[in-house]
Amino acid sequence: GYTRTFIYGGDSHFDNMTHYFSHNGFDIVDRRKSYRLKEDLPTHRTRIEDDQVSFENAWAVCDADVYNTLLKVVDAQHKSKQPFFNFVMTTSNHKPYTYPHGVVDIPSGKNREGAVKYADKTFEDFFRKAITKPWFKNTVFVIMADHCAYSAGRTELNIKNHHIPAYIFNLKNERPTEVNKLSSQIDIFPTLFGYLNWSYTSNIFGKDISKMTRKEERAFIGNHRKVGLLKNNQFLVLETNKTHSFYDWNEHENTLTNTETDSLFLTETISYYQAAFELFKNGGLKIPNKVVVKRTH
């Protein structure tokens, strides 16, 4: 199978990522600033050492350092002739928006635009290096935001603030295509597997966007306290204390209007989130001991 590695420029104990990725079969490469007396992980964890860091803020090392680490990891994986899946997380597009001096024409720490410009420049530098590597032609790149700039919070769910970009790049025999369908992050892997023409068995909730019908389009939106389902320009939000709100959504004006709850819509929304929770809680999302993935070409 594929060797799996999570690469992060900060300490992966943040948001419990160390436990999550290691218990899902990923080795971890991170800054590892915190040392516990005992860390019993089922996989291997490697620290990004000081001599590999050119710039660092409270979040993590800069994107360029993360990508340089990634290149070294992939070179070693390719040399071992082992197929690889690497999950990489960068942080430069976060406050305080600091990054190495002189890389872009907006001073470090000034604003989000500077951080975005720096993140974009490091993308370019990474791909200029990656394209020279022997593994590039057989490697697919997925670029996706974990959230947009203004999606944090504990109260209101602004739908437009949860619109993020996603790209699948370097697919063989595929023409550039723009897909405008209502979908979510969970759909990226089924979509990728569809483009790769893989036959597989899975219990994941996502769908192949390229084959998704208008009737199947939906998005899952949430923050620290609320979760919701958006479908057919209707939006149901599950709130604390078993309460909920139901809205009609005007996509063009991005406005929500309270309306009478559709009981079937409410049941569907609860079912999605409760089923996912129960499966996760009871180990139902774990990979069985024997899983066969057939690649067809």
Q: For each predicted feature, which ranges?
A:
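Solvent-exposed soluble domains appended to multi-pass membrane proteins
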Residues: 1-297
